[in-house]
Amino acid sequence: MALDSAKKAEIVAKFAKKPGDTGSTEVQVALLTARIAELTEHLKIYKKDFSSRLGLLKLVGQRKRLLSYLKRKDYNSYSKLITELNLRDK
């Protein structure tokens, strides 16, 4: 369940700190959130797709680690990001 290039470019443009920024923590979290949303919709239809479920859990764990890092390093950016992505603060 990969994102198409147009949607990916839109997300990168929205969350990038500067033009061409594809590796910042904010961009990575936003891309992971979009992939998680797509996989969640897929799993609502195909409930027995366990390999996709494991992939989803891996993505959720990766996003959790990145959010934890961002919360430690730049709390203002973290709080702005979770409000934009409608994520819960732990």
Swiss-Prot record:
Part of the 30S ribosomal subunit. Forms a bridge to the 50S subunit in the 70S ribosome, contacting the 23S rRNA. HAMAP family: Ribosomal_uS15_B. It comes from Campylobacter jejuni subsp. jejuni serotype O:2 (strain ATCC 700819 / NCTC 11168). It comes from the Bacteria. The gene is rpsO. GO terms for cellular component: cytosolic small ribosomal subunit. This is Small ribosomal subunit protein uS15. InterPro entries: Ribosomal_uS15, Ribosomal_uS15_bac-type, uS15_NS1_RNA-bd_sf. GO terms for biological process: translation. Keywords: Ribonucleoprotein, Ribosomal protein, RNA-binding, rRNA-binding. One of the primary rRNA binding proteins, it binds directly to 16S rRNA where it helps nucleate assembly of the platform of the 30S subunit by binding and bridging several RNA helices of the 16S rRNA. One of its GO terms (molecular function) is rRNA binding. Belongs to the universal ribosomal protein uS15 family.
